[in-house]
UniProtKB/Swiss-Prot annotation:
InterPro entries, alphabetized: HflD, HflD-like_sf
Lineage, opening ranks: Bacteria, Pseudomonadati, Pseudomonadota, Gammaproteobacteria, Lysobacterales
Family of this protein: Belongs to the HflD family.
Any matching Pfam family: DUF489
Name of the protein described by the UniProt record: High frequency lysogenization protein HflD homolog
Principal cellular location given in the protein's record: cytoplasm
PANTHER family with a match to the protein in the record: HIGH FREQUENCY LYSOGENIZATION PROTEIN HFLD
Membrane topology note: Peripheral membrane protein
Length: 204
């Protein structure tokens, strides 16, 4: 994979699969450990030059690529997911322009990365709690506010809320990468075919 569109769809897949886990946790209280770990690891790989470097490989965002394929072919089963994704892509614009918030988030990520290294697990509950608190103290105050709906029983649990916020932070990180790779909301109008073809290549 080398074209900018190939890179963009990998980053967009990162957004999609992080948000799918947000939806899953909000509804069921449970997540897929491997997908959560990929999302959290992407937050810590801030110096990676390519999407493959951020996620590990295209295989690690295969769930997100399948979500994109289903969206583009009108087979998506969760109407809330595209709305969440749009909110995150819009939120990314506000975030990167707020230099004070960017600096605070960067320092918080560095601290959480050290904690993950000490604990030996990037998806440890304490790490998720730290990342969730970081999101709550910073990005969650920006607009548009990402509204997560789900089962009130689970959304009332501190651990569930922390994991959701950590995944929202990961989604924003992927949105930043998408924009760095040349992504734009105009792609969905004027480059849809190129996006579909790039997703198909990534899934081969």
């Amino acid at each position: 994979m080398s074209s900018s569109m190939d890179h963009r769809v990998l980053a967009l897949a990162g957004v999609a699969q992080a948000l799918q886990q947000v939806r899953r946790i909000a509804e069921t209280g449970h997540s897929e450990a491997a997908t959560v770990r990929t999302a959290v690891d992407s937050v810590f790989r801030v110096d990676a030059a390519t999407p493959e470097g951020v996620y590990g490989s295209s295989a690690d965002v295969a769930p997100g690529l399948r979500l994109l394929h289903n969206y583009f072919t009108n087979q998506g089963k969760d109407d809330m997911l595209p709305r969440l994704a749009l909110a995150v892509l819009q939120l990314e614009r506000r975030f990167v322009r707020d230099h004070s918030t960017v600096e605070t988030v960067s320092k918080g990520i560095e601290a959480a990365a050290r904690q993950a290294q000490t604990l030996g697990d990037s998806a440890h509950p304490d790490v998720l709690s730290a990342l969730g608190a970081l999101y709550a103290q910073t990005i969650s105050h920006l607009r548009p506010k990402v509204m997560v709906q789900g089962n009130p029983h689970y959304l009332g649990q501190a651990g569930v809320v922390a994991e959701i916020r950590a995944l929202l932070l990961a989604a924003v990180r992927s949105a930043v990468l998408w924009r760095q790779m040349g992504g734009s909301l105009w792609d969905f109008l004027f480059a849809k075919r190129a996006m579909i073809e790039a997703v198909a290549r990534a899934l081969r």
